[in-house]
């Protein structure tokens, strides 16, 4: 075993073997593995393999060869074996995981478990390091002083700070898990911080603000230029009191902070939430942020708070956790507002207290995330998205129309500019109980139990405020209305006739559907929900079907001429044109028959049609419902499709006549209101209905068996 001489060897050359044995004997009870490279660096001239081999020899022998040489060495001022063992365990055998490198603001903190001798060896070349070692002594009840090495790479500066251990742990709780109460252990910890030197100097002055030696020094103050860096550093170091102070400062001086060249993107979600919770939506709206560094983030947190069902928000009485869209009226509603905001006329009900409630139907295809994204694409600002959403979920009551309305519909109060006119019994209207608005020719009932708002024009809703004296500014209702009026250009949505088409507003120049106070026999047992809505919609459907029927009749005689020449020959095309000319007079004759109102002609037509189509209400074309083998395939397919379309048009029209025919017949028979009241009117309707049924049975000459008993008189 060869040993090389080294000038840096602190031990005599003859004692290298003894020093190695002393080190290896102290490692006998240490758990494996052992870093033999670190052991070899302590004793020059030995390789890691030689150290491991010697360690195995000492373990197998069980005795220490340095027992006889230990006392003479100690007499000359050697190192105690216990101190050597603790030094080796702390310097060589501590796990590497004791070193931590984390971000604090714009720098890092590194806590490294290292021996004091090694630190002294590295710092001996600089006067600053030697001065820091002088401060490495204990100071009374606050424990030993800790040296913190701060390195600012951006400014190329280095500085050491000294702080008592107990004060450092109590203020910066981040170090509590790394700094042990054992004095020996604290001397072995080296703290390195990579951040701005001025920020850390501010933090250390804040930590020592209550120290007796700093009574005459001024407490450091927060400024717009340094508060963000101090906030992030203090939050990482777990300085909760300083974090709370920084958050309050940000709340009061946010406009000045965003005007400085600070990076607001380094604020994490936790700090952002705590800052945003201190802002009311009016305070957030007053923040002057030209570059939008932080204002949009505050409103994003405000939007999240609106959707929190457990959060009590002073800015918004309602929350959006139950927001949905009605598939009928297309309004966005919450669970609290769905029974107060009106829907289509057919979706009305009465609760147990006699109040009108509305029954909305949830649209399952609507997604709130897609709605917020589309709203942001439309408004281009999260601030505007918040206010639009705020106006969507909150509602007020109009003192003019006595109806609840959403805040985003504050300009949708419907009214008629002219009062309704109720003519006398001899007028041309169907019933004296029915009036008309001259402004739009819309009919209205004299006694309307629902009292729903109807009108052809809209205006602003009027909200009545409670009388209050000098404390009007502290009234929540006043503040709520003030927020609405100040941002109504963003909150309010334009009035849409499509969404209010069934609320009484006439959408076209055509006369509206006639509805009076006459009761049909089936109304004695209660009218079905949505029946009036069905009547209103069937009128528009009937108009559309009339247009479709006219188009289909014209297409019936032009289908053959649309066939291309490559599929149909010239002779076939000529014969088809001649056939079309023969059909056209039949069409005109058929139209003239429709305008004839003679009863005898109708009887003859009914008897002829009965023999051919078995009392079917639909016209059957004997020539068009057959497959013509002499024609091309395309011609027959087109004819079949047109025939199917014509049938469906006739079926739909017949169903409409079934629904509306009885009502129109009763209206035609009613000339004036009975003097006996509602009961006389009901009796007249029943008699008229029975009389019309008797006449219909007499017109159809069908032999029936003679009844055995006489028919009873209707009651």
From Swiss-Prot:
GO biological process: isotype switching
Domain SANT: 21-59
GO molecular function: identical protein binding
Composition-biased stretches (Acidic residues): 552-573
Alphabetized Pfam families for the sequence: BTB_SANBR
Span of domain BTB: 146-254
Ranges of Basic residues composition bias in the record: 578-605
Region feature (Disordered): 552-623, 689-715
Residue ranges with Polar residues bias: 614-623, 690-699
Comment text on domains: The BTB domain is important for homodimerization and for its function in negative regulation of class switch recombination.
Function in brief: Negatively regulates class switch recombination or isotype switching in splenic B-cells.
Subunit structure: Homodimer.
Family listed: Belongs to the KIAA1841 family.
The protein's name in its UniProt record: SANT and BTB domain regulator of class switch recombination
């Amino acid at each position: 075993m060869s040993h090389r001489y080294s000038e840096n060897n602190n031990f005599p050359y003859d004692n290298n073997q003894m020093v190695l044995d002393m080190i290896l004997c102290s490692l006998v009870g240490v758990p494996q593995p052992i870093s033999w490279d670190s052991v070899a660096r302590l004793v020059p001239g030995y390789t890691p393999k030689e150290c491991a081999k010697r360690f195995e020899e000492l373990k197998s022998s069980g005795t220490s060869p340095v027992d006889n040489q230990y006392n003479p060495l100690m007499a000359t001022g050697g190192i105690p074996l216990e101190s050597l063992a603790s030094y080796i365990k702390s310097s060589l055998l501590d796990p590497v995981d004791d070193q931590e490198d984390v971000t604090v603001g714009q720098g890092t903190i590194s806590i490294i478990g290292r021996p004091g001798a090694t630190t002294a060896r590295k710092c001996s070349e600089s006067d600053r390091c030697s001065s820091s070692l002088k401060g490495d002594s204990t100071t009374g009840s606050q424990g030993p002083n800790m040296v913190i090495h701060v390195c600012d790479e951006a400014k190329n500066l280095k500085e050491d700070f000294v702080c008592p251990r107990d004060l450092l742990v109590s203020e910066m709780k981040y170090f509590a898990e790394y700094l042990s109460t054992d004095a020996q252990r604290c001397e072995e910890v080296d703290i390195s911080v990579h951040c701005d030197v001025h920020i850390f100097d501010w933090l250390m002055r804040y930590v020592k603000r209550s120290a007796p030696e700093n009574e005459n020094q001024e407490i450091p103050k927060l400024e717009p230029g340094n508060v963000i860096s101090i906030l992030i550093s203090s939050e990482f170091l777990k300085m909760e009191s300083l974090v709370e102070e920084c958050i309050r400062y940000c709340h009061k001086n946010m406009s000045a902070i965003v005007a400085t060249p600070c990076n607001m993107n380094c604020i994490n979600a936790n700090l952002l939430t705590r800052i945003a919770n201190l802002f009311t939506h009016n305070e957030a709206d007053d923040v002057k942020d030209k570059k939008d560094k932080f204002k949009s983030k505050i409103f994003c947190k405000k939007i999240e708070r609106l959707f929190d069902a457990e959060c009590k928000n002073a800015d918004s009485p309602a929350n959006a956790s139950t927001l949905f869209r009605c598939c009928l009226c297309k309004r966005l509603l919450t669970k609290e507002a769905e029974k107060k905001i009106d829907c289509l006329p057919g979706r009305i009900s009465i609760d147990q207290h006699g109040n009108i409630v509305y029954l909305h139907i949830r649209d399952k295809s609507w997604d709130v995330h897609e709605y917020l994204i589309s709203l942001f694409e439309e408004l281009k600002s999260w601030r505007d998205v918040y206010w639009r959403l705020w106006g969507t979920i909150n509602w007020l009551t109009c003192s003019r129309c006595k109806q609840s309305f959403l805040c985003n519909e504050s300009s949708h109060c419907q009214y008629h500019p002219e009062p309704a006119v109720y003519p006398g019994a001899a007028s041309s209207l169907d019933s004296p109980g029915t009036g008309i608005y001259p402004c739009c020719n819309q009919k209205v009932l004299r006694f309307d139990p629902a009292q729903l708002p109807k009108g052809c024009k809209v205006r602003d809703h009027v909200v009545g405020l409670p009388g209050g004296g000098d404390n009007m500014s502290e009234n929540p209702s006043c503040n709520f209305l003030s927020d609405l009026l100040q941002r109504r250009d963003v909150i309010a949505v334009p009035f849409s006739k499509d969404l209010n088409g069934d609320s009484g507003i006439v959408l076209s120049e055509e006369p509206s559907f006639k509805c009076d106070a006459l009761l049909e026999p089936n109304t004695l047992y209660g009218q079905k929900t949505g029946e009036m809505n069905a009547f209103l919609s069937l009128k528009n459907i009937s108009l559309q079907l009339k247009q479709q029927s006219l188009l289909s009749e014209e297409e019936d005689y032009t289908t053959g001429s649309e066939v291309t020449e490559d599929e149909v020959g010239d002779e076939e095309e000529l014969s088809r044109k001649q056939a079309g000319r023969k059909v056209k007079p039949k069409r005109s004759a058929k139209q003239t028959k429709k305008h004839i109102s003679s009863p005898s002609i109708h009887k003859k037509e009914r008897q002829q049609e009965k023999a051919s189509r078995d009392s079917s209400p639909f016209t059957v074309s004997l020539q068009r419902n057959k497959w013509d083998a002499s024609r091309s395939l395309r011609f027959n397919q087109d004819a079949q499709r047109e025939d199917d379309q014509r049938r469906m048009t006739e079926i739909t029209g017949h169903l409409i006549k079934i629904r509306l025919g009885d009502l129109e017949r009763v209206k035609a028979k009613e000339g004036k209101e009975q003097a006996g009241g509602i009961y006389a009117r009901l009796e007249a309707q029943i008699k008229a209905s029975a009389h019309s049924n008797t006449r219909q049975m007499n017109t159809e000459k069908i032999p029936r068996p003679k009844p055995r008993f006489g028919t009873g008189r209707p009651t």
